[in-house]
A protein has these predicted regions:
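Alpha-helical membrane insertion/targeting regions
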Residues: 1-161
Length: 161
């Protein structure tokens, strides 16, 4: 595994800060919203994290992490646009919740793969993207994502947002 570059460190630190703010926002407000300051900071940091991911090419060129970065950028932009314009009417809250919650998934999949292929430094837990431990983490994250999304949709429906 190549060493982490300066942009890689910046990307990692911003990404960790983003995730921490995202969890805080989720547990405080039940869903992310551009109208809540912690959520807004999360979304800006997520956008920066995703854009910096597009500049990291030390692992063999354009890959799945870059696709996740593009999806995260699109999710943030679409979610903010729909939340601010309410263009989808009553479905707007569901749509921006889908977009913003999806950014957690787009963070976690490449982060888990990269972390498991780097740590511990002397003997990483995984050798490749297709290592079973990475696949298990990815399956767990997808399950958590769908449970969280269903919970949020039920909460939105019950609150008539």
């Amino acid at each position: 595994m190549p060493e982490i570059t300066l942009i890689g460190w910046f990307h990692t630190v911003i990404g960790i800060a983003s995730i921490l703010l995202g969890f805080y926002s989720f547990f405080s407000f039940k869903l992310l919203s551009w109208n809540k300051i912690p959520s807004r900071i999360y979304l800006v940091l997520t956008f920066i994290t995703a854009v910096t991911a597009l500049a990291i090419y030390n692992q063999g060129g354009f890959g799945i992490a870059h696709i996740m970065g593009i999806l995260a950028v699109l999710a943030v932009l679409c979610g903010v646009c729909v939340e601010r314009t309410r263009i989808l009417g009553y479905l707007s809250t569901y749509f921006y919740t889908l977009c913003f919650t999806s950014t957690f998934l787009f963070h976690s999949l490449p982060a888990a793969a990269d972390t498991l292929r780097r740590l511990p430094v002397d003997d990483p837990l995984a050798d490749s993207l297709f290592d079973p431990i990475i696949l298990y983490f990815h399956i767990a994250f997808v399950i958590i994502y769908f449970i969280t999304l269903i919970y949020q949709f039920i909460w939105i429906k019950n609150k008539n947002l």
